[in-house]
Amino acid sequence: MNDVITAEFDENGRAIRRIRSFVRRQGRLTKGQQLALDEYWPLMGVEFTPEALDLPTLFGREAPVVLEIGFGMGASLVAMAQQHPERDFLGIEVHSPGVGACLSSAHEAGVNNLRVMCHDAVEVLERMIPDASLDMVQLFFPDPWHKARHHKRRIVQSAFAGRIRGKLKISGVFHMATDWENYAEHMLEVMNHAPGYRNLSDDNTYVPRPDSRPVTKFELRGQRLGHGNWDLMFERVE
């Protein structure tokens, strides 16, 4: 696998430092995760390149495409791929242990409608995802960066909302979920002011958790800690 970020330099050759929504940490791979990377990455892994993907070629068919950003260990992503064989799923995660775990689960489940990447999702969106190509984008339980001085690291910002809109088809949906109330409020504020979207909530706030979203590890952890859960769904309308 390539590095999770691409080095960028200005005209004077100085490295450009982007504000990123994640901290780079490799983590230790279990034997099973390493085996999955060795065995199944060639089948389901997608390397980062600065060229747009041909999604029908990638999956070998024309089908609705769901992009999930930050799939963690991949359990819910694999479950959705199992439940919806009529859709194709592309998952992005920056931490290789999670990618290995997802590949292992996908192989055990026998799914063939799932591909994964190990790279910065913002770079993937900028370089590899064609405009108006996605039926849904999922962002479940991203890092809330709860300290005020770190709020600039939150992935849901105005520019990000605009980038997602450009990649969604008309009527495509951006589905977010968080167990951090302040982040939910931040997401709602950003998205309600983002042009070209319609909030699918009846009262212009949050939607009930749809049955289509499996309960994630982070959601269960939040429930044990007494946290609530907030789902937001916004449709691209223009």
Swiss-Prot record:
For this protein, the record's InterPro entries field holds: SAM-dependent_MTases_sf (IPR029063), tRNA_(Gua-N-7)_MeTrfase_Trmb (IPR003358), tRNA_methyltr_TrmB_bact (IPR055361)
Keywords, in A-Z order = Methyltransferase, S-adenosyl-L-methionine, Transferase, tRNA processing
- List the catalytic activities from the record: guanosine(46) in tRNA + S-adenosyl-L-methionine = N(7)-methylguanosine(46) in tRNA + S-adenosyl-L-homocysteine
Query: Where do the annotations place S-adenosyl-L-methionine binding?
Result: E68, E93, D120, D143
Query: Which positions are annotated as binding substrate?
Result: K147, D179, T216, K217, F218, E219
Q: What is annotated as the active site?
A: D143
Domain of life per record: Bacteria
Q: What GO CC terms are in its UniProt record? A: tRNA methyltransferase complex
Identify the PANTHER family for this entry.
Answer: 3-DEOXY-D-MANNO-OCTULOSONIC-ACID TRANSFERASE/TRNA GUANINE-N 7 - -METHYLTRANSFERASE, PENTACOTRIPEPTIDE-REPEAT REGION OF PRORP DOMAIN-CONTAINING PROTEIN
Q: What does this protein do?
A: Catalyzes the formation of N(7)-methylguanine at position 46 (m7G46) in tRNA.
What protein name is recorded for this chain? Answer: tRNA (guanine-N(7)-)-methyltransferase
Q: Which organism is it from?
A: Edwardsiella ictaluri (strain 93-146)
